[in-house]
Amino acid sequence: MKCKLCLENEDIQESHIIPDAFFRFVKDKNDNVGKYIEVSEAGNKLGQVSYSEKLLCRKCEQNFSKEFESYVIEFTLRNPKNIGVSSKRSTKQITFTNLDYRKLKLFQMSLLWRAAISSLDFYKYVQVEPEILELLRKSLCELTPFEPHILPCFMDRVFLNSPDKNLSLSDLKQSKSSIFNPKKTVSKPLGIEYVTFIFGGFEWRIWLHKCSEFYVHEKKVINPSGVLISPIVNIETNELLRGAGVIARGNELKGKGLK
């Protein structure tokens, strides 16, 4: 079996689509049974795995980790100040400055590409045209990010409840402890098609086509200026989160809740 990225090396490693750090974040310090909850029509259950499979060779896996994964983990889960990123929160949005465009864009591209080629059920709804997958593969292999308007990713900051000025560390951690199966959405009236991931306290909404330069200029997607504006959303205002809550509650009523 050859590496799915470079198509050459055969020392294939276990690769995580959503990096393992995001799953470990929601487990306890002793790495006991997973604390995150999987919600599906089959029922609610505690997750215990971080969904990996053999995809990349050791060299490509290490390149991903070194070039952008470690950076994004620090930005989302730990302390953005450690990588020089500043943030300013208002009631409706968070403005991040001094982000590394190359690293964040490559991470977004790798997320979509790996999820789309995965054989795991967790990612079964991520479907991308072969031509796009090949463009992603080549660019990721060369570690060259797309332009901001190509396969743009809109990042909403997700909280369980609307945050106030005195947000506690516990509330902050809780806001980053949700991981959802990615979902593909097609809106024919609006002419858009996108895949949504939720993990690390963000909704990552990746369009499967180009976007208007308006979104780039307004800092709605990551761009070379390093400024990104993330709207603040919560369960009540987020369709995917609200839908998962309805399914979870329905499972409980049917006797398919957590055992």
Model-identified regions with their sequence ranges:
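Mixed-charge, polar/low-complexity N-terminal
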Residues: 36-38, 43, 93, 178-179, ...
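Short, low-complexity, polar/charged sequence segments that are solvent-exposed and flexible
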Residues: 31-34, 76-78, 216, 224-227
